[in-house]
Amino acid sequence: MTISLARYNFFISLELLKTLVAKGVKYFVLCPGSRSGPLALAAASLSKRKELTLITSIDERSAAFLALGISAASGQVSCVITTSGSAVANLLPAAVEADRSCHPLLFLTADRPLRLKECGANQAVNQQDFLKSVCRHFDESPKEGIHLISKERLTSLVGKSFEMASNIPGPVHINLAYEEPLHPCELDQKKVLDGWVIEGFLKGKITPTKDEVVKSFQSLKLLKLDPFSLGIIIVGPWRGKVKQLNSFRGALKKWQKLTGWPILADPLSGVENDQEGLINHWDLFFSIGLFEKIKEIQVLRLGPIPPSRELQTWLKKPGKFQLLITEGDSRNLDPIGGSTQFSEGFSCWVDKMLEVIPVKPAIDKKIVSKKLIKELIKYDLFIHDWLDKRLFRNGLITEPALARLLPRLLPESIPVMIASSSPIRDWLSYSGEGAFLRRCFGFRGASGIDGTLSMGMGLSIIMGRMVLVTGDLALLHDTNGWLFSKDKNISLIVIMIDNGGGGIFNQLNIDRIEEGDFEDIFLMPQQVCHLTLAKAYGLKYKQVACLDDLEKAIEWSFSLSTNVLIRVCTNSIEDHRLRVNLSDDLKKTLSENLSSFD
């Protein structure tokens, strides 16, 4: 009796997924397709047996960002399964973000066999090359068909791919050719599930492997800073592994206690509010020129640089001895070009530094930095009170006021995802200590608006009840993300800032446009009612008109367990004027009330 090739395809697909599960992959996001049918059947079988968690999505781009959110929150490899053709192209935006943000992500894509390539066959494209430029690793099955793969090759393929996704976390692509027939009959499925094995395919026990990988960089010479001299710490978005974040925080506490250096942290840095030396409104310090009198200083930069233009301008000026430390990522992460990079991680660097620092000198080792941090804290407290009075005095909702008030209205245990463009920049400038009361997530790898809602949904699968702050265009760009609302494990409060399009472009330095309309070519407002759209997806929603309404809407949203939408309308032109006026008025007020530091 001849055994159908479909049974072989199903068997190998099942073995492949079992091997991934044994490695520790728990979450699989499945997109529809015929060529990927054997993988779909295998995933469904393992899901029914509670061996993996299966989530389905009709949109490959949305699916990839959902998986990205799962990986970002858990620190574990998540997997996306797609069919062939343009389906694979839709994975690129999430792959780009996973690469730059260092999140472990695995793409399993079904493909046509070699005989159908380069001959005009339908849906046969060079998909094996679509993601290579941003992936940590690419591998594939035998081009003639996955049914020809051996046990040893399968184990090697999965093992290497998992290691490359986990080592310096990032995206990995495995392309799998499937020869027809693709779909096993019920008898073939039952035979495989009951233990049938391809003759000669050694079915050994698959054992989980510990996360022990060899570092991809060579041991570097210890790059030193003088803890007894003037210095400052700049902490960018967290790019290490989730499980390493606590040791990073511990190392930061050690180094700050030793040096007394002030800390300027990005909202996505993972730094917590109880960190000594944390300066909450540092971005405004740069915008009003408070750092201009500091001519020479050591700068310890941890991770990518925050997106403050004023900070970057200051760092480019002479007199800054800069050391950049990354969490295992040896790629150049210095767009300024003024630093020396150490890639073995901050905890490692601090431990090595503590071994070589001389005995504590007789004088107070913090005396040099004491004056600086004392002055910064004085300014920080003044700005804190000043912003509260300016932003809350009339009860109107503005984007800066929203960034300042929202963190105070949310329980401290509630994580927040902050979308790109205006929201993340306003949190950087105006949220104050609120950004450090909880874990914040966002797109700071490629800073796009692709997949904003879907990533928020993925984060919620791991984090539970959480909040997404997004603009109207970013939300509209990914409305298919609402389709995940059927998943009972997702509980997302979406606060949408509706400013009539791409409000951030009002901040461009364009006096006027010779030909064309600024609104048409930059803002691009859309004639869409988001509340009606929410209703179409079966969501509960609220409209907010003032700051008092916001507090009531937040209380209402937390009384529910489902996904909800809160719409907040703002005026992007007026908010741009407000930001400029805040900077100008603050500079004037400080010059009248406080003495500047040297």
Curated annotation (Swiss-Prot):
E.C. number: 2.2.1.9
Protein's recorded name: 2-succinyl-5-enolpyruvyl-6-hydroxy-3-cyclohexene-1-carboxylate synthase
Alphabetical list of SUPFAM superfamilies matching this protein: Thiamin diphosphate-binding fold (THDP-binding)
GO biological processes: menaquinone biosynthetic process; phylloquinone biosynthetic process
Cofactor(s) for this UniProt protein: Mg(2+); Mn(2+); thiamine diphosphate
Metal-binding keyword on record: yes
InterPro entries listed in its UniProt record: MenaQ_synth_MenD, THDP-binding, Thiamin_PyroP_enz_TPP-bd_dom, TPP_enzyme_TPP-bd
Binding note for cofactor: Binds 1 thiamine pyrophosphate per subunit.
UniProt pathway annotation: Quinol/quinone metabolism; 1,4-dihydroxy-2-naphthoate biosynthesis; 1,4-dihydroxy-2-naphthoate from chorismate: step 2/7; Cofactor biosynthesis; phylloquinone biosynthesis
Highest taxon of source: Bacteria
The family this protein is said to belong to: Belongs to the TPP enzyme family. MenD subfamily.
Single GO molecular function: thiamine pyrophosphate binding
Sorted UniProt keywords: Magnesium, Manganese, Metal-binding, Thiamine pyrophosphate, Transferase
Catalysed reaction equations from the record: isochorismate + 2-oxoglutarate + H(+) = 5-enolpyruvoyl-6-hydroxy-2-succinyl-cyclohex-3-ene-1-carboxylate + CO2
Subunit structure: Homodimer.
CDD domains per UniProt: TPP_PYR_MenD, TPP_SHCHC_synthase
Described purpose of this protein according to its UniProt entry: Catalyzes the thiamine diphosphate-dependent decarboxylation of 2-oxoglutarate and the subsequent addition of the resulting succinic semialdehyde-thiamine pyrophosphate anion to isochorismate to yield 2-succinyl-5-enolpyruvyl-6-hydroxy-3-cyclohexene-1-carboxylate (SEPHCHC).
